[in-house]
C-alpha cells in the first residue's frame, strides 16, 4: 500500500531521533494520518507478508473481552507473549535464569537468546497446560477487550461499549458519539501495556460505515500493519451486522516511530513494489460480530512479498 510506504519514507527523511521506554531508540514524528478506501480492497501489506490469521484471532480475542494470552496461544498466536512473560519473570515464582532486559539481550547475545527462547517455550507450555498458572500469569490486566466490553464505572457497574456502539449505529447513525475508548486512566498502572490504539470512532454517510482510529503510539514497522488490517476488519464486521457498506478507514497517529533496529528492514520494504489488494471473505453463518470464529474470516487473492523479520521491543 502506497500510503504505508509513504509513511515509512516520511519518517526516515523527516523524523527526529528520540529515546524511548524500551531503550532501543526511535526515529519519530508526531501527528500523521493515512486514509484507506475499503471499497478498493482489503488494506493489508503486500510488500511483506502479514499473518492475517493472527490479525483475526487477536481481534476476536478483543471482541470476546478476553485479556489472557491462553486463547491466543491456543490459536498459535504469539504476539502478546513477551508482555505476559515479562510479568512472570519479574515475579517471586520465577526461578530460572536472569531475564532482565530479555528483549535487548536476546538481540545482542546469541547465547542468551537460546536461554531466553527455552524459558519462553516452557512458559508457553505452562500457560496452555496449567489453568491456574494461566489465570495468574497469562493475564495482561484490563487491556483492550476488557475496556471495550466491560468498562467499569464509579458505581461498580460495567459498560459494554462495543455492543452499545453497534446498537447506536442501528438506531441513531447520525450520532457524533459513535466512540469506543480503551484509554482508562484508572486501569493504566495495572495493564501489561497501556493501549497504543486507544480510541476509535465510526461515521455513517451515504449508506457507508467509516472508522477513524486514534493511535497514541505507533510502531510503524511491526505494529501498524496489524493495526490497519485489524480495524479495517472490525469496520467490515460491524458494517455487515448493521446492514451498511464499508467506507473509509482513517488511521490517525500521535507518536509514529521506526525503531532504530528496524531501519534496514524498512529500507528493504521500500525497495519493493505494492501488489493488488486482496478481498475480504466473511462467512454468512455468524449472526453477530461476537459469533465469529477464526475459520469464518479469510482473504481471497492475497499474494504478498515474503515476510521481513524484525525484533520486538518490550
Swiss-Prot record:
Task: List the catalytic residues.
Answer: 196
What is this protein's record name?
Thymidylate synthase
Under which EC number(s) is this enzyme classified?
2.1.1.45
List, alphabetically, the GO terms of the cellular component aspect.
cytosol
The residues the record assigns to binding dUMP are: 21, 176-177, 216-219, 227, 257-259
Tell me, which GO biological process terms does this entry list?
dTMP biosynthetic process; dTTP biosynthetic process; methylation
Q: Pathway of this protein?
A: Pyrimidine metabolism; dTTP biosynthesis
Function in brief: Catalyzes the reductive methylation of 2'-deoxyuridine-5'-monophosphate (dUMP) to 2'-deoxythymidine-5'-monophosphate (dTMP) while utilizing 5,10-methylenetetrahydrofolate (mTHF) as the methyl donor and reductant in the reaction, yielding dihydrofolate (DHF) as a by-product. This enzymatic reaction provides an intracellular de novo source of dTMP, an essential precursor for DNA biosynthesis.
Amino acid at each position: 500500500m502506497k500510503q504505508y510506504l509513504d509513511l515509512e519514507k516520511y519518517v526516515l527523511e523527516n523524523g527526529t531521533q528520540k529515546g524511548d521506554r524500551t531503550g532501543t531508540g526511535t526515529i519519530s514524528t508526531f501527528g500523521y494520518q493515512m486514509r484507506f478506501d475499503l471499497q478498493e480492497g482489503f488494506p493489508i501489506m503486500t510488500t511483506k507478508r502479514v499473518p492475517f490469521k493472527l490479525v483475526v484471532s487477536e481481534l476476536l480475542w478483543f471482541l470476546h473481552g478476553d485479556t489472557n494470552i491462553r486463547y491466543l496461544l491456543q490459536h498459535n498466536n504469539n504476539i502478546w507473549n513477551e508482555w505476559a512473560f515479562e510479568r512472570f519473570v519479574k515475579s517471586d515464582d520465577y526461578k530460572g535464569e536472569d531475564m532482565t532486559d530479555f528483549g535487548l539481550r536476546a538481540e545482542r547475545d546469541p547465547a542468551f537468546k537460546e536461554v531466553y527462547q527455552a524459558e519462553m517455550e516452557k512458559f508457553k507450555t505452562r500457560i496452555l497446560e496449567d489453568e491456574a498458572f494461566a489465570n495468574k500469569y497469562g493475564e495482561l490486566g484490563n487491556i483492550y477487550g476488557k475496556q471495550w466490553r466491560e468498562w467499569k464505572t464509579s458505581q461498580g457497574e460495567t459498560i459494554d461499549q462495543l455492543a452499545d456502539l453497534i446498537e447506536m449505529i442501528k438506531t441513531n447513525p447520525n450520532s457524533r458519539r459513535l466512540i469506543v475508548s480503551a484509554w482508562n486512566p484508572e486501569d493504566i498502572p495495572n495493564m501489561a501495556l497501556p493501549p497504543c490504539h486507544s480510541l476509535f470512532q465510526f461515521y455513517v454517510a451515504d449508506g457507508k460505515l467509516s472508522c477513524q482510529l486514534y493511535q497514541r503510539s505507533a510502531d510503524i514497522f511491526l505494529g501498524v500493519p496489524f493495526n490497519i488490517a485489524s480495524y479495517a476488519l472490525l469496520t467490515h464486521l460491524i458494517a455487515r451486522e448493521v446492514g451498511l457498506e464499508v467506507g473509509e478507514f482513517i488511521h490517525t497517529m500521535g507518536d509514529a516511530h521506526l525503531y532504530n533496529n528496524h531501519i534496514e528492514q524498512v529500507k528493504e520494504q521500500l525497495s519493493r513494489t505494492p501488489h493488488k489488494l486482496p478481498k475480504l471473505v466473511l462467512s454468512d453463518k455468524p449472526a453477530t460480530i461476537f459469533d465469529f470464529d477464526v475459520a469464518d474470516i479469510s482473504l481471497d487473492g492475497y499474494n504478498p512479498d515474503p515476510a521481513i523479520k524484525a525484533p520486538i521491543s518490550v
